[in-house]
Amino acid sequence: MGSDAWVGLWRPHRPRGPIAAHYGGPGPKYKLPPNTGYALHDPSRPRAPAFTFGARFPTQQTTCGPGPGHLVPARMTVRGTDGAPAYSIYGRPRRSAPFLTPGPGRYFPERAGNATYPSAPRHTIAPRNWGVQAEQQSPGPAAYTVPSLLGPRVIGKVSAPTCSIYGRRAAGSFFEDLSKTPGPCAYQVVSPGVYKSRAPQFTILARTSLPQDNTRKPGPAAYNVDQHRKPRGWSFGIRHSDYLAPLVTDADN
């Protein structure tokens, strides 16, 4: 294309910075607070006062007395219930069923076992204090914790002062072994650069190499000289094209 196609001094060039029209943003995805209305208003914008109409309160209804639900007994007077006698009619009591005495066929003497025959006495040795522990609910002497009466920490009792003997101190006493004190070698020598002017220090860095291409290059074995480009070939196409409409005549109808 020649230079005649361009008009003026403008030529296509790469933009200096990103252009917003070239990128697809999320659009109205962010839910920002509105600037209209009173509720959920943007706090960074001024908001005008809003007025509402309140609801009408119902009128208070006064009652003069109890309604039909207040039932007053008929025998109730100003001074209480009247003293007229009242009688009630109870139902007829039900007759009790007669006692059915068992006949001779209800007894089985053969099942009595040793109860009907003489047998030697048998005794059972029960454990000690049988039935006493189950009925006793009071705590024993071991349930109470009595404070000790020995020592200075007795509650409600006067006690004499007590003294305690502590162990000997290894440092500062008269029997301290002074040969175990630290010598001059135990202290670390402070560097003179801390309290004096420090000389400049230099470091030797490693040798830097020029930037170069470190990608892997194919060697001689990567090329196969026996492979050649295949020559051009021909193929037989279909008789009718799929993109051509069939011929329809009046005789076909």
From Swiss-Prot:
InterPro entries from the UniProt entry: CIMAP, SHIPPO-rpt
Localization terms from the record: Cell projection, Cilium, Flagellum
Keyword line: Cell projection, Cilium, Flagellum
STPGR repeat residue intervals: 182-207
Keyword Ribonucleoprotein part of the UniProt annotation: no
Recorded GO CC terms: cytoskeleton; motile cilium
Protein family (similarity comment): Belongs to the CIMAP family.
Protein name listed in UniProt: Ciliary microtubule associated protein 1B
Organism of provenance: Homo sapiens
